[in-house]
């Protein structure tokens, strides 16, 4: 079991500065650096993964598109979606990439179960699904045994922009969110529950809230 997982709660932040800060943190961390998870919401943005194909961007319109270095295809971020960036020393944790993805998916499945929502993962399509509709997306990058990027959970947001793309490269993939399945929901409460599930499933002994910026 690893020691302590640090969380930074960043609120609503533009995507690109957070992306640059993630890269910088990953490049500069030492073997003794504490693992961190950054919890954030983003203004409306489409992000294109390393394998992303232009044909999956149907009509982006006025929503900006940012090319990233995470795995996967195109997805959408917007207010009311809870994003968690996992800045972990995966080698130190002793996880393979597939195990890390599975642990993240199980954390999300247990979080949703706490709201009486039955969800599942798919072996051939990372993420978490409810009755075939996607409620959470995953996209990671591992560099020198350290992870960055992470997950996006649809909580209480406008899902319409997903219709401007083929989400995660799948034409016609239905998207859903927690509000539509469990009724009115407080994002702060979901954030707290997600923290607990990630600590549990990633096998940390405890968690702490980190203060200060990410510049």
Curated annotation (Swiss-Prot):
Stretch forming the signal peptide: none
Gene3D superfamilies cross-referenced by the UniProt entry: Bira Bifunctional Protein, Domain 2
GO biological processes: protein modification process
Keyword tRNA processing: no
Active site: 168
InterPro entries in the record: aa-tRNA-synth_II/BPL/LPL (IPR045864), BPL_LPL_catalytic (IPR004143), Octanoyltransferase (IPR000544), Octanoyltransferase_CS (IPR020605)
Residues the UniProt record annotates as site (Lowers pKa of active site Cys): 134
Matching PROSITE patterns: BPL_LPL_CATALYTIC, LIPB
Keyword vocabulary terms for this entry: Acyltransferase, Cytoplasm, Transferase
GO cellular component: cytoplasm
Record field: catalytic activity: octanoyl-[ACP] + L-lysyl-[protein] = N(6)-octanoyl-L-lysyl-[protein] + holo-[ACP] + H(+)
EC assignment: 2.3.1.181
Enzyme class, UniProt record, top EC level: transferase
Biological role stated in the UniProt entry: Catalyzes the transfer of endogenously produced octanoic acid from octanoyl-acyl-carrier-protein onto the lipoyl domains of lipoate-dependent enzymes. Lipoyl-ACP can also act as a substrate although octanoyl-ACP is likely to be the physiological substrate.
Note: In the reaction, the free carboxyl group of octanoic acid is attached via an amide linkage to the epsilon-amino group of a specific lysine residue of lipoyl domains of lipoate-dependent enzymes.
Protein name: Octanoyltransferase
Lineage of the species this protein comes from: Bacteria, Pseudomonadati, Pseudomonadota, Gammaproteobacteria, Pseudomonadales
């Amino acid at each position: 079991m690893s020691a302590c997982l640090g969380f930074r709660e960043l609120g609503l932040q533009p995507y690109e500065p957070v992306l640059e800060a993630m890269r910088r943190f990953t490049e500069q961390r030492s073997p003794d650096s504490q693992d961190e998870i950054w919890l954030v919401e983003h203004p409306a943005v489409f992000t294109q993964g390393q394998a992303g194909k232009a044909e999956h961007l149907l009509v982006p319109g006025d929503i900006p598109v940012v090319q990233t270095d995470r795995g996967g295809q195109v997805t959408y971020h917007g207010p009311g979606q809870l994003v968690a960036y996992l800045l972990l020393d995966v080698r130190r944790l002793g996880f393979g990439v597939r195990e890390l993805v599975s642990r993240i998916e199980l954390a999300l499945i247990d979080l949703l179960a706490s709201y009486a929502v039955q969800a599942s993962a798919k072996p051939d399509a990372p993420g978490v699904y409810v009755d075939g509709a996607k409620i959470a997306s995953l996209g990671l990058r591992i560099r020198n045994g350290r992870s960055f990027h992470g997950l996006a959970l649809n909580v209480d947001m406008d899902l319409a922009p997903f219709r401007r793309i083929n989400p995660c490269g799948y034409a016609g993939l239905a998207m859903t969110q927690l509000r539509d399945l469990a009724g009115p929901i407080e994002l702060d409460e979901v954030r707290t529950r997600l923290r607990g599930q990630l600590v549990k499933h990633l096998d940390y002994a405890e968690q702490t809230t980190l203060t200060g910026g990410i510049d």
